[in-house]
């Protein structure tokens, strides 16, 4: 650095040392006296009084270096004593011992101070130990899980189950379980949270050990520590999987120093003194101005200082920075000196003044220091700033967070610094996403929420379903002032949080600036590259789980990103009227197939990208003018095939595979981890099936474009925004898309990334945060029940009253705490503004799906997460935000609901979508959609053509496809119209709990007559629609009920064994599911018979008789199994096993009764006679099963004991709240009708020889013969067999025809052909 003095004095970095004695004069330097006064004012000695002008030595730039040497001289004792402290053994630079002092698998940072658990319970210690004196070190808690932090000796041996504190000479504090550990464990301290700092103190003079949490002492934890020969203590930690911390042994200033205790690593005292003196000189430069005209010095505020290019000032600063720059490579000095100085500016000045001052200071750093020095200094500065922000305590006014964010903004406003930090630091070295996070306080009293929200309130839910008594209303009136006071406190909190959020949005606006491209790439395009890599690391399933961005950070980052994105989107709209506003935003479909945006290995709707490019290459050419080179396509395919055959060295370099060897591994810190998929993605993209040609004019429809997919790092601004008719990201526009641009292409990519972020982890985190609200509801219910018990408690039972009062106090205190926490959660996660952000994402996804659908087969290129986000964001708005804010108040809510309904109705059976998971998600979303009245009405509002197509898909045969959800949807459309089918929860179960009221299955019946009519019309239309659908329903009913009976037989056998045994809960769940399926299939049959009875009863149809016989057979089977007293079903129901709560007589019997009533009571007499004859002809029919429905006892068999008189019998008459009098009258009419008809049938029946009975069913006489094999059966059996199989039941020969057969006569005319 000393060689930089040559050259012109005022050139770039040429005036570092400008004594230049060989030159006769220096132009521009002030006269000697003023220069002497100025330099003495700047470089005054801090230890002595200011000498008089006559006694002090004259100063000029020739003797200034000598003066500086004297000024910066410190006591030699300070430097010599560095690292030579009694009571400490080991290196002076204290780090974690990743070579030998560990147990288990751990990930260690590059600086050897941060550690992440990667095994069950890993342990690591430091390289330095202490045996005498008072020592302290700090641990920055990054995650609040299971950890034991403290001290151990070198002889302690740990394993995957035992860590620090589990051996005799190791001591630990565990804030997760709020305990201290030394072989045994006792309660100690407070619970810690992510963002806290634990100070570990050891006093080896007194033999005590204690801890502090965020600077507050938790008291002495252990006494009488073992001391003496061979007893030295190492800092140590044991942590479970995915937990992470960072240590500060003294390499940085302690956040909470403790008087009398020394950090394990000594601070650089001598360099610190020098740096502080140089900083004082620098401050003096900023507060003094030269007035050459008057020949005097002018004092002024440092915030008003401007660099005006005066040679004297520049040379002075050059001398300061010549000494200051080498010191700023030390982390300790950057944080203790430079950071403190900059924070002081931010705290004292207005935001505008602070930004101007910081901007000038950064200008000076870049001017007087080498680039590598500035870059290293900025890197350390931002890392320190992020640590300060992340680990600062929450105070009522959030003042600390505001100061740190204001300084961050001031630094990022400096263009050169911003671009360097974006390119090399913000996403590569540190988790910059932390800057957008507002941590939730675990201890509300420390965050000052008690003062901010002095009055607490929580909703009092009535225990009565949907009914509020006068007492409840009076209580609500009494609570109203309290609720309003609570809401005012919440608003005060929200306003303070909004200040922090606004600063965070400012940071992102700076990072998304695209007008700072002078002298290099604009910030926005650097951000896009880093943002895409960040998404890739978090999207990859093979990434390192502990290194992924925590979901709570993602939530905050997403909301700030949406705010900044919409700001720039609408700003572009203001200057370009033809563009779209952010309310009309969507992602054009060509982004998904032109290869300009990397979607890594994420699944597309149509499957793998390589497969789609092969199968849809003709559609790409015809619709998007994109040609795929077959040779490159083949290369891509081979590259995918060879992916698993990587060379051994390459595979060994993968981080995940390297971890398998065990031990503590140095962990690189680019972002969260260099994703293992990055190499594959880039290799795929570089050999992708498209090559680039930039046309200079608009393309005609006959021209085809060959495009080449570029990796993220290779793209330029032109590749994104486009130029000279090259549309950039929008290359390959389909004819359905408008020509005018929506907005800047770079903003489209940011929007695409925001949608991907929501899918990665934001939705799951939104669901987790609802837990606080659930806790409030549970405690509120418990408090209400306790207060009721206190009111009912007899006065003489003072002991019970005391216990109840104690419980009441505990619940009240817990609710006070939770209600304040809930206010914080509502302000940071579930506010109205956050709800609008998620709603905006939902509408963006809907428009994107609609535009993609118009491209026909190219819709298959869309990533699956667009449909997932559309489904999940609506679910979040309804279930997570809905209890706090009404969805109906959202702008355009009804229209959005209808558009989502149209997408679900169209795409749940879309053949272009092949992924099983996404198809299941669509089906489940539609099933949930039809459960709620407002969303069901939205389905009814979609165009009739789409409604009919949806119902047609629902009526497709159930074979060879997932049919349970389809059947559930049909059942929901019928619920409320069926026989005794108006219940929300089964009659034998308890009433609905308030917290369960939002579940789809517990919604009140809301049938859709419109969709029922569509179903009836479709079943009447084609000759094959109804038979194929009903045949599949009957097959599934036969399977489901048979499986159910088989399972309850096993359960009954297990229950009757004398030895102790347990029934597998999974078996019980499957059993209950089969029962529910049987009931729902019966309900679908009831709906079909009610809507279109002629399918079964009009025997002019070729399949009606066969369907009716099969239906009668199944109904009799169900009735016989369920209605027989003291049989298998009856015994299992009386067991009331957990898991079989839904198994009961009522749901299945009323479903069967509904079908029988429709067949035998409603309709003309000719139809009822046909149904009656078929039902009675079935050999399984028993009249007692029908009598059972009305509670009539079964007549005892001869010699059998009479039934117990007090035995409770099932009867539909007992369910007056669920079955109307009219329905009961119909059952009685049906019973009378069947009693009469069965008596007549018994009198008219003739005995049949066994040889004449059908050899398949042994119930009906032989009436058909198969050709050509000649085997015989009844017509019902062969018709049913031919519905599913064309081979002979007996010999497996192919049946050509079936002919009528009568005993003693030859075959007659052919009745049907196979």
Swiss-Prot record:
Residues 968-974 are annotated as: Interaction with NFKB1. One of its GO terms (cellular component) is cytoplasm. Its main location: cytoplasm. One of its GO terms (biological process) is proteolysis involved in protein catabolic process. It is an enzyme of class 2 (transferase). Zn(2+) 2 binds at residues 1269, 1271, 1288, 1291. The keyword Acetylation applies. Pathway: Protein modification; protein ubiquitination. Residues 74-254 form the B30.2/SPRY domain. Residues 460-481 are annotated as: Disordered. The keyword Amino-acid biosynthesis does not apply. Residues 462-481 have a biased composition (Basic and acidic residues). Ubiquitinated, leading to its degradation. Deubiquitinated by USP19, thereby stimulating CDKN1B ubiquitin-dependent degradation. Keywords: Acetylation, Cytoplasm, Metal-binding, Methylation, Phosphoprotein, Transferase, Ubl conjugation, Ubl conjugation pathway, Zinc, Zinc-finger. Its EC number is 2.3.2.27. It is found in: Cytoplasm. GO terms for molecular function: ubiquitin protein ligase activity; zinc ion binding. Zn(2+) 1 binds at residues 1254, 1257, 1274, 1277. Pfam families: SPRY, zf-C3HC4_3. Component of the KPC complex composed of RNF123/KPC1 and UBAC1/KPC2. Interacts with UBAC1 and CDKN1B via its N-terminal domain. Interacts with RIGI (via N-terminus) and IFIH1 (via N-terminus). This is E3 ubiquitin-protein ligase RNF123.
